[in-house]
Amino acid sequence: MASEQENTADFGFRTVARDEKEVMVAEVFHSVAAKYDLMNDLMSFGIHRIWKRFTIECSGVRRNQRVLDLAGGTGDLTAKFSRMVGEGGEVILADINASMLKVGREKLRNKGIIDNISYVQANAEALPFPDDFFDCITISFGLRNVTDKNKALRSMYRVLKPGGRLLVLEFSKPIIKQLSTVYDAYSFHILPRIGEAVASDAGSYRYLAESIRMHPDQETLKGMMSDAGFDSVNYFNLTGGIVALHRGFKF
């Protein structure tokens, strides 16, 4: 008989049933999809582009490889990977949320980025791909929204080729006390107001702030990746630990 903890999950600071969380997270991203890119620029003052560029640099992706951009949303990383793998490679943009996938597809097609990209609606906990399929997997600002993170990490490990690498770019825990104080004030008081003003949705951005606080810290996530089977797991603190990039290999 499953324990109460096994049947529940965090939705921000609230504890909800696991299946309820998936529905609630879906509603958040259906709501924010149309304004997602604009809000990313406003919320991070454009710094998210630097974080993503660093992720690309750490990916080791080469021509003719196959890449999974998981929880790929509006396709920022997919666009870069598409050019890196070339005509002989493939990038799969996967997202559980149909609205985000639609925005990403339209954005990339409007930029003329078409030929080597596929779009798949997929749950990170049960990826619909064969074993040992991808040379590289990235999940950017998506893992904290997954209900069962350990299950998702195991699923990523399964579909990654031996010699491949996983990159997890995610909000984390500031390593400077003064920065943490300022960051909390910004996240809980200013961010929801920006969400209300720009996207008419303070609630979704309040969830964003809460979900960041509930996400595992740097060392905990490193341990989770190791437990899922990844080797040589390390991480890089970015912007004082506001964001961390975790990298693990499958040998």
Swiss-Prot record:
Protein name: Ubiquinone/menaquinone biosynthesis C-methyltransferase UbiE
Job of this protein: Methyltransferase required for the conversion of demethylmenaquinol (DMKH2) to menaquinol (MKH2) and the conversion of 2-polyprenyl-6-methoxy-1,4-benzoquinol (DDMQH2) to 2-polyprenyl-3-methyl-6-methoxy-1,4-benzoquinol (DMQH2).
Molecular function per GO: 2-methoxy-6-polyprenyl-1,4-benzoquinol methyltransferase activity; demethylmenaquinone methyltransferase activity
Record-stated family: Belongs to the class I-like SAM-binding methyltransferase superfamily. MenG/UbiE family.
Pathway in which this enzyme or protein is active: Quinol/quinone metabolism; menaquinone biosynthesis; menaquinol from 1,4-dihydroxy-2-naphthoate: step 2/2; Cofactor biosynthesis; ubiquinone biosynthesis
Gene Ontology biological-process entries: aerobic respiration; menaquinone biosynthetic process; methylation
Catalytic EC class: transferase
Keywords recorded for this protein, A-Z: Menaquinone biosynthesis, Methyltransferase, S-adenosyl-L-methionine, Transferase, Ubiquinone biosynthesis
Entry EC number(s): 2.1.1.163, 2.1.1.201
CDD domains documented for this protein: AdoMet_MTases
Stored Pfam families: Ubie_methyltran
Catalytic activities: a 2-demethylmenaquinol + S-adenosyl-L-methionine = a menaquinol + S-adenosyl-L-homocysteine + H(+); a 2-methoxy-6-(all-trans-polyprenyl)benzene-1,4-diol + S-adenosyl-L-methionine = a 5-methoxy-2-methyl-3-(all-trans-polyprenyl)benzene-1,4-diol + S-adenosyl-L-homocysteine + H(+)
Organism of this sequence: Pectobacterium carotovorum subsp. carotovorum (strain PC1)
Positions that bind S-adenosyl-L-methionine: T74, D95, N123, A124, S140
Domain of life: Bacteria
